[in-house]
A protein has these predicted regions:
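Bacterial N-terminal signal peptides
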Residues: 1-5
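N-terminus-centered regions that define maturation/targeting leaders and the start
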Residues: 8-172
Length: 172
């Protein structure tokens, strides 16, 4: 009688975390325009257990509750090298040295590149802000800082190996 025993280890789960946002945004992350008076500082983000074959990462922040019929893109950053495992607070400010060399921040729904914090309409209730890190199978998306959120999203989904998200809330 032949008996085989195989132990299969499942890969660790791709995860995203933040020391800055844990359920609720602080005034550090809130936008500083459109009637909001926050500091507009992107949150610290760190991720672990990217799948094998990851060649780059991308970060997005999206508000599906914005009263636009199509949500609101607050941040799109891509072409982050595969060696990147963390972004410090403030990395979303264009020109901030916390953003890895070669990474691109493209246009948001605010009209320009870089992080734009939460600023929902007054009395609209708390909105959810979905922060996602994408592990990608390409080192470069082939897009530039003028790429629209729709084009970035389409391209990310076509190159995605895995994604991990956290959600925080803010209302005024």
């Amino acid at each position: 009688m032949l008996s085989l025993s195989m132990s299969a280890q499942s890969p660790a789960t791709f995860t995203l975390s933040s020391n800055d946002v844990g359920g609720q945004a602080t005034m550090r992350q809130v936008f500083n325009s459109f009637g909001c008076t926050g500091e507009n500082i992107s949150p610290q983000l760190s991720w672990a257990n990217a799948p094998e074959g990851t060649k780059s990462f991308a970060i997005t922040v999206y508000d599906p509750d914005a009263p636009t019929g199509s949500g609101w893109w607050h941040w799109l950053a891509f072409d982050l090298p595969a060696t990147t495992k963390e972004l410090p607070s403030g990395a979303g400010t264009p020109g901030n040295p916390g953003m890895p060399s070669g990474a691109i921040q493209s246009r948001t729904d605010f009209g320009g590149p870089g992080y734009g914090g939460p600023c929902p309409p007054p009395g609209h209730g708390a909105h959810q802000y979905i922060v996602t890190v994408f592990a990608l199978k390409t080192d470069k998306l082939g897009l530039d800082a003028n790429a629209t959120p729709a084009v970035v999203g389409y391209t990310l989904n076509g190159q995605m190996l895995a994604k991990a998200s956290i959600v925080f809330y803010y209302g005024r």
